[in-house]
Amino acid sequence: ANNKIILDVSEGLLKLATNLRFTMGLPFDVNHTDPLAQASPLNDTSMFLNKQSGHRFLRLDLSHAGANNKQWQYHLGSANCESESADAAPEASCAFTNRVEFILPMTQLDSELALEISVSNILAQVDLLEADSCEFGSPEAQPCKQLLRNLLNRPWIKWD
């Protein structure tokens, strides 16, 4: 699991920082490279669909115990990528890059900061019992559209 963000920064520079800014996603040239040729964590094949679509940037695999263990997945990655086949990387950017940028205020001057993620805010207004899974489909289809809207506009990640 990729559960840490490691900052390579001096203590002095950290004290001057006012925000932590990062992007959930990968640059185009890295996203479509064979994971077996990449260093960890990008070599995790469970987070890679194929060369055409690239890596998953966020993966939620859920089940609902009260609904006959219905499985539901949300896999955020680039979508509508055009290439000769699924085994070929595209030559141009995908129609939907689906990279999500974060800017978190640095209010604590501590080298051991923890982030809290609210899955309920990511899934807000999505009926998991009725909605189809969202796995690299068109981001304009429901529930993909609502999930991406939640990632971009709802406070689902914050300092703990």
Walk through the language-model features, giving the residues of each.
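A short, solvent-exposed, low-complexity linear motif enriched for acidic/polar residues
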Residues: 1-160
